[in-house]
Amino acid sequence: IGVRPNDFSRTPDEFFHNVAQEQRRGLHPRWLVREQSYWTPIGVASGSASALLNEEGLLEVDRGSFSLEPFLFADGQLVTWADAEITQQLEDGSLPIPSARWRANGFALTTTAFATAVSGDPVLFVRYRIENTGDAPRVARLFCALRPFQVNPPWQAFRGLGGACAVGELRWHAGAV
């Protein structure tokens, strides 16, 4: 425990920026180490809700809400976006179903998100796919962190969107958060 100056936590965003600066790169979204990350929206044409997927696989599940961030644990090491070679793609090259793909330590992790309407309501789906890219069998674990961060960084804030966000309540129901 230490005493910090007021500027360390002047705003929630500054607090999280400063915490991220003191930890290993990759443990937090890229914008928390003041690096730009690009993103794409995901939604349905008639829906009022929309999600964002950034190039590292961070998924903001609804406008201005929390995000889901994947991590792999393999061979006693935590693998993050900062450890990986990252590419992006659209399903079949042109369908509006974006994916972010990591390649690191003999594994590939692909995060794919899409939305559709179910009974007239927009529903977001996300798939995490882990592939062993080596020759020998290996074990890996997927951790999906629910984070109080939007995909948009605070320097792209618009109408209250961008940066850290409050998570007021979480509920597990029928196998879903």
Q: Residue spans of the language-model regions?
A:
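Terminal accessory carbohydrate-recognition/targeting modules of carbohydrate-active enzymes
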Residues: I1-V177
